[in-house]
Structure formats: C-alpha cells, structure tokens
C-alpha cells in the first residue's frame, strides 16, 4: 500500500473540508453578487467605514503621499453598493547596494476589514486575495502577509494561491487586566529606573528639531539592515496628523538616544518602528527605556494591548524576541506568508519551509 489507512483518512478529511469551503464560497458569492474592485487612486475609493487603521482609506492616502509607496485597496462590494470587505496592500520600492539594485515588494498587515460581514471573512478573503494576485505587477518580487488575528486564517486560500507559510511568533502585552509594572521583570525594571535616575527621559515629539532627530536616528540605525524598510519623513508626519499614531523620543543631556513610532488600531497599540543608540549609551539602556515608556503611554491612553509588529527572524536564538518578552508579553504562534515572483524559487522555498 502506498498510504496507511490513517493517512488515507486524513487526506479524505482534508479533501472534504476543501470541497465544502469552495462550495460555501461559491454559494456566498452567487447569493450576494460580490464584485471585486482594485483601487490605486484616492478618487477611486468607495465610501466605507473602517474599524482597522491598517486597512483604512486614511492610511491609503498617507501611503499615496509617501515617496516609494504605492497603495492598493482591494474592495469587495455587494450588488446593492454596500462594501462587504476591504484589504489594504502597499507596494514599496527599495534601493539595494547589490544587485538587484531596485526591489519592489508588497506588504499586507492583518487580514483586512470585514465590518458587518465577519461571518463571511474566509469567503471574502479568498475573493480579494485571488484578484490581488492576478492583478499584481510582474516587477513585484514578493508578497508578504503577517499579523493575522488567527494562525490558521486564510490557510486554504493562501496555500492554493502558491503562498508558503513560515512559522513565526507574535508578541503582545495585555494592558487591560494588569498594569505594565505588574508584568515587567524586576531586573529589567531596575535597569530602567536606574537610567531614568541618571537623567534619561522619554516624551512625544513636540518640535521640528525633535522630529528631525527622530527621522535621522531611525534611518541611520536601520541603514544597514535590509530586512527593515524605513519610509520617508512624510509618512511619520501624516500618521501623527491623522491622530492614529504617536512618535516618542528618548533623550539624555539633550541628545536623542532612542525613538519609536506606534500606531493605534481597534483599541490596540502597535509598535511599528524603533531605533536606539545601544552601543554608544550602553549603561543608559535606551532601548529598554524607550519601549517601556511606549507601553506606559499606550496604557495611559486606554489601549487594551501593546503589540510588536517586529519580533525578529524566526530563529531559536533571537535576542530581540528575548528582549521583548522581558516586558511580560505573551508569545503567540503564528504564520507569516510569502509568495515569490519566480515560480522555481517559490517551489524551492515552499519545500524548505515545509520541513
């Protein structure tokens, strides 16, 4: 026998689940007469209520005004004109010092917004992602999706579209049941209090000079880190103006030694970008103080959770992940999905990450 009875039953079960999923998907699309439109200009956007900042028309317009960014809003619309769901993707152009000197990649944070149609999330996500993959320009090297609310959300859809899953880790700090002081490790809190006693302080960016220091440190710190993409200063200015984000800087003797930017969406804070002068100010712990004050600011603003969008690469030895967990956060197993432009490379990576 090629397969044992157990394997045959597992394969049969998965096949039945897949068939049922697509039958429900076809019925839903037929009954609601769902059409998918792809918007690349602000004037094309239909009116809709967005509960998720990462998939809002506001962030779309911010990306539109930011150099090297091309936002794409995928909208699922009913026959009567109602917007059933929308998903924001952004195509970013990066410059490299080695070939290829220019690289385009598409980034999606979260699974989209399904306000009023939450029970049909799977079917709507399938429709939107299928159209987005068809539409995607040929020069885009890869597509990346991350930070889903559920690990298994979209598994069938993304696997069927040629995406491969990489085991990842999401970390968030709960702010609703205990104060940050009750969760942080005593050793880390001692370091932070010691640095504050020496004159280190964190506050929101208030002046143009502080904003310039924020942008300079962020870009200088991440210049030789190809994994991290830092947008133009326009992006950060407009995020603050939208009221959906905050910029913090940590200073010592009027010198900026740390900074971070976090966004607020659906009652949660998301640490988006950060930079620190760790080596130059080793005993002042700029990273520890900056992140700690960001968590405290989010707590004081009434946020329910403080989430980290970047916890480092999925390796067993990960200093960034260990550092973040020191604040008492909760690690949650997750997938991060990728799809490469070149089919042969995509097949190789799919096999590599399937082990």
Language model segments and positions:
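A conserved beta-strand-loop-helix scaffold within acyl/acetyltransferase catalytic domains
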Residues: 32-79, 89-95, 148, 152-166, ...
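Aromatic (often tryptophan-rich) hydrophobic motifs at membrane interfaces
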Residues: 75, 114, 130, 241-343
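Conserved acetyl-CoA binding element of GNAT-fold acetyltransferases
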Residues: 96-115, 169, 268-279
């Amino acid at each position: 026998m090629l397969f044992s009875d157990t394997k045959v039953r597992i394969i049969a079960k998965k096949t039945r689940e897949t068939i049922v999923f697509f039958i429900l998907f076809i019925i839903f699309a037929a009954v609601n007469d769902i059409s998918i439109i792809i918007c690349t200009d602000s004037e094309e956007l239909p009116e809709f209520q967005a509960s998720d900042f990462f998939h809002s028309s506001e962030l779309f317009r911010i990306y539109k005004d930011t150099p090297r960014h091309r936002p794409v809003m995928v909208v699922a619309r009913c026959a009567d004109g109602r917007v059933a769901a929308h998903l924001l993707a952004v195509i970013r152009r990066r410059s490299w010092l080695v070939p290829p000197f220019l690289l385009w990649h598409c980034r999606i944070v979260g699974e989209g917004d399904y306000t009023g149609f939450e029970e049909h999330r799977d079917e709507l996500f399938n429709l939107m992602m299928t159209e987005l993959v068809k539409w995607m320009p040929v020069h885009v090297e890869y597509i990346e999706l991350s930070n889903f609310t559920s690990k298994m959300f979209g598994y069938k859809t993304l696997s069927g579209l040629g995406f491969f899953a990489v085991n990842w880790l999401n970390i968030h700090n709960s702010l609703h049941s205990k104060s940050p002081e009750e969760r942080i490790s005593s050793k880390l809190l001692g370091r932070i209090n010691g640095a504050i006693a020496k004159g280190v302080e964190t506050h929101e960016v208030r002046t143009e000079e502080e904003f310039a220091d924020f942008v300079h440190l962020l870009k200088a710190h991440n210049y030789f880190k190809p994994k991290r993409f830092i947008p133009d200063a326009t992006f950060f200015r407009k995020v603050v103006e939208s009221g959906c984000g905050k910029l913090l800087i940590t200073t010592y003797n009027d010198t900026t030694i740390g900074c971070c930017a976090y966004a607020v969406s659906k009652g949660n804070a998301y640490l988006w970008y950060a930079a620190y002068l760790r080596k130059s100010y080793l005993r002042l712990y700029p990273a520890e103080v900056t992140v700690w004050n960001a968590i405290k600011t989010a707590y004081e603003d009434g946020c329910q959770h403080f989430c980290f969008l970047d916890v480092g690469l999925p390796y067993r030895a990960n200093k960034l992940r260990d550092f973040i967990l020191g604040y008492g956060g909760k690690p949650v197993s997750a997938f991060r999905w990728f799809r490469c432009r070149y089919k042969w490379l995509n097949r190789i990576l799919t096999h590599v990450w399937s082990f």
